[in-house]
């Protein structure tokens, strides 16, 4: 399945209402076998207002290609670039990706995520979270994390968070983060926080 979207405006205002959702058909953890679903979205604006509502969401081994998007999320657990169980591949080039809700990083990775030439900003959350045997690569990006609010039982403010939750959403193993030609700003707390991975 291949879907291409260009110059669209998406707004959601319900719990669990992601802006654009790509599911590859595999419900197992980090299984590369999927139905080949690929979503390509370009030159578009995505706004989500409620909880559990990511901007672009990829699961089940799907492939998401995003180019020059303006993504804003306001709810809790609503990453601008979001992945979940089953992982997949996400490639983002250009655009602005902003979150204002608690537990809503600019990027939440249970997949292979590459972001290039983009602006990432989180107000009340970590900037980037990588869970389990997954990775995020930044190329020529700006990442700013204000991190004004702790979420749940968290006791530490942190920008780039690598961990293993044992929830089953991500395969066990070493998380990976790489940044080249990028500017990372941490307004509060640790820039890097690594635990249990």
Model regions and ranges:
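Surface-exposed loop/turn motifs in large extracellular/passenger domains
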Residues: 1-13, 20-49, 57-77, 82-102, ...
